[in-house]
Amino acid sequence: MTNIRKTHPLLKIINSSFVDLPAPSSLSSWWNFGSLLAACLAVQILTGLFLAMHYTSDTATAFDSVAHICRDVNYGWTLRYLHANGASMFFICLYLHVGRGLYYGSYTYSETWNVGILLLFAVMATAFMGYVLPWGQMSFWGATVITNLLSAIPYIGTDLVQWIWGGFSVDKATLTRFFAFHFLLPFIVSALVMVHLLFLHETGSNNPTGIPSDPDMIPFHPYYTIKDILGFLIMLTALSALVLFSPDLLGDPDNYTPANPLNTPPHIKPEWYFLFAYAILRSIPNKLGGVLALVMSILILAIVPMLHISKQRSMMFRPLSQCLFWLLVAVLLTLTWIGGQPVEYPYVIIGQVASVLYFLIFLVFMPLVSAMENYLLKW
């Protein structure tokens, strides 16, 4: 008798995606982050759903409703901190996942890569709107500053900002629509994840060597399911430790002060996972230039496949490119640090140097070094 998982219309889709899927035998732990991201998304949707049952998206009650969740709802504090710190875990996994794609040349699967960039933008938008919902000082001023950036768009900028706000400032209408979109977007992200997987399974997985692995494939289950479960356990242990021991480690103390339009915090800054982009934005003295640099800091990933001129796909056997990659990581960490510092000497100049380096590595150094490696290998 044929196994039901191979004949049932629904089960055979799951079977071909997670059970009998042929996978390269050499995948390292860097390939765990896809499944970890799926786990993060599931945790975020579940905790978010339960939080939404108690949250009110009204400027008069939003802050108090979050306090009520933490104080009066059974395990409300756990839900709230799982959701807040789950977002941090989500972005850690996201950035490592993208870094893996850059290092091992996975971006040559252009459809999968482009859907991945769309996913990155969607998750960033979701996280930004979620940060506004507790209606603390940093929520309000973060929303004001970031939405105001759209006013740099010529001709339609000011109208666009007022249209997004639903008035002449960030107020009740803004909070209500941000809650609506924050609730909706994770489901759109889930749909995009399906498309991401669909494109991935069209080509099959890349592997650390970057060479075709057709002659050496193994079934996804049990080999990689067990590996993924270990990844889940490690991530959930880290998340639980963060939630139970220092839930406010990655948050901003200013967000425990209710939003006050008459009092600006001394340093307005976003959550830590946006600081690198915020530093790039601040390093350009022109408003429109800053906004373009901010968008390009992520969108530059879309042109990475076009700039790939190396004869080898992965960086595994390209030591010069490896040095550049780790320089890029160092630059990103520097930008993250600068984004959290006040706008004064020497932070401004460090941020500007790091921003220029960030774009130079992608646009100039990577192609140059690839060409040099090709020449050294006489290709």
From Swiss-Prot:
Required co-factors: heme b
Membrane topology per record: Multi-pass membrane protein
PROSITE patterns in the cross-refs: CYTB_CTER (PS51003), CYTB_NTER (PS51002)
Residues given in the record as heme b b566 binding sites: 97, 196
Binding residue positions for heme b b562: 83, 182
More details: Heme 1 (or BL or b562) is low-potential and absorbs at about 562 nm, and heme 2 (or BH or b566) is high-potential and absorbs at about 566 nm.
Protein name: Cytochrome b
Organism, scientific name: Brachyphylla nana pumila
Protein encoded by which gene: MT-CYB
